[in-house]
Amino acid sequence: MGLATAPLGWTYVAWFGQIPLWIWIFRANTTRLNFTQLKQFLISRSLTAIAWGGGFYGVALFWITGVHPLTWLGVPWLASLAIAAFCWLAITAWGVVLVFVWLLAMAVWEVTTARTKVNSTFKKYLFILWGTASWCGLETLWSHSILWWSPVAYTQSPSQLHFLQWGAIGGPALLSAFIVAVNGFLALGLIDFLDGKTVNKNKQNWHYFLIAILIWLFCQGGGWLLYQKPLADTPEEKINVGIIQGNIPNQIKFNSEGWQRAIAGYTEGYKKLTEQGAEIVLTPEGALPYLWETVVAKSGFYQAILQTQVPVWLGAYGTKGDGYTNSLLTVDGQGKLLGRYDKFKLVPLGEYIPLSNVFGQLIQRLSPLKEQLLPGDRPQVLPTPFGPAAVVICYESAFPDLLRSQLLQGGEFILSSANNAHYSDTMAAQHHALDVMRAIEGDRWLARATNTGLSAIINPRGKTLWLSAMNQYEIHAAPIYRRRGLILYSRWGDWVVFLLLVVSAIAWLYQIVFPLNQR
């Protein structure tokens, strides 16, 4: 399953990558589970979750080890290796826990519905319904935690744009639901084919496969129809945005060499973009990694703003009480702060330490600041000269509900600002894939500026109109458009999850009400 994710992008693997997990569930007989078997039950589920979860989350998220070496932060080489390994194991384990809880939920369904007179084939349909609903429910729950990146849905991004259009209807949960259900029916068909238990073998063997194919055709065909809807943007809503990809390595980012290189690169890029007609310029997360007051007092970049009088979205740090924030600032053409967005979803261990009273002395922080960063408030939108903007800073791209809350507050376009220099090219490709999904779900234009790549312009159908190279200094100017309407997912959020769970609950009660008293 991990092979389906960007940048490798073997997206078709996702449509059968969950089959082994489904087959294991169908083969495991939990209908007569008792307490004496509980230990073996938990062990078998744990091992299965580790095997499948490790193959998906462990492979897809292996890029996290790219933080090593951290010697540029003064961390010894071996300690840096230990930190990288711990981060990878932690995020993989969190995914494994999701799979384990799902396996428990499936077992609970089997045990509680074992004594029923419901037709066995229909019972299997209901079981797949529950599997789909519970998986989507768990992914949604996990997406509200502090640690999230990898829904099953993102295996289809950025290449499968027709299928991804369903995100505008039901968000990532609907995409995951299609994939999980298809895997479930394919698994049933494969089991039935191998067992060959029925009298009318050919008919029985193929109807599960047929259902899986019909679901796949429906979501692909329906997505194609959604993709054909014209954008209908008007010239009055156009904003000419300039993007600067600074390409400042982390190894020098926070010393005098990095400061001088950043000032020179961003100032030169800013001036060139204004000459090309950019009405506002977007910079990456932490483009100038200091407080705004320092930027004003000590940088030629600020003087360039005063000279050209073209506003800028600047990645810098802000203050909040006695702490600091990772912020994107709107600076108008007179050099005044017009607005500020403070990053809400901070990176665990990198920007703050969860349960710092317990673990603060055990784990070295990856942040260069002397203090932990503080989260911003929610919801926020960023005031700009062109209307309110929805913003995601780096890690926040993985949290669709965070962006949706900003659209509900009036966000008319999306700004994505990231560093990405900490990690490998794999992370940059997956980050871009997530932003493609966010643009579709929000029905908004998205401008994306990163330090080392991949920077991009993405339209509301998820089409990438421009994509930068990796690890190169680049500037680019392109139009985006303001949009104000709210589509189904933006307005109603995870209604698909709620609907699936309600229907599953009704199906469960139906089976409980009709126990197996005659057969």
Swiss-Prot record:
Gene3D superfamilies: Carbon-nitrogen hydrolase. The keyword DNA-binding does not apply. GO terms for cellular component: plasma membrane. Keywords: Acyltransferase, Cell inner membrane, Cell membrane, Membrane, Transferase, Transmembrane, Transmembrane helix. The keyword Transferase applies. Belongs to the CN hydrolase family. Apolipoprotein N-acyltransferase subfamily. This is Apolipoprotein N-acyltransferase. It is an enzyme of class 2 (transferase). GO terms for biological process: lipoprotein biosynthetic process. InterPro entries: Apolipo_AcylTrfase, C-N_Hydrolase, C-N_Hydrolase_sf, LNT_N. Its main location: membrane. The gene is lnt. The chain crosses the membrane at residues 6-26, 47-67, 83-103, 126-146, 174-194, 206-226, 496-516. It comes from the Bacteria. Residues 244-482 form the CN hydrolase domain. One of its GO terms (molecular function) is N-acyltransferase activity. It comes from Synechocystis sp. (strain ATCC 27184 / PCC 6803 / Kazusa). The active site is at E285 (proton acceptor), K343, C394 (nucleophile).
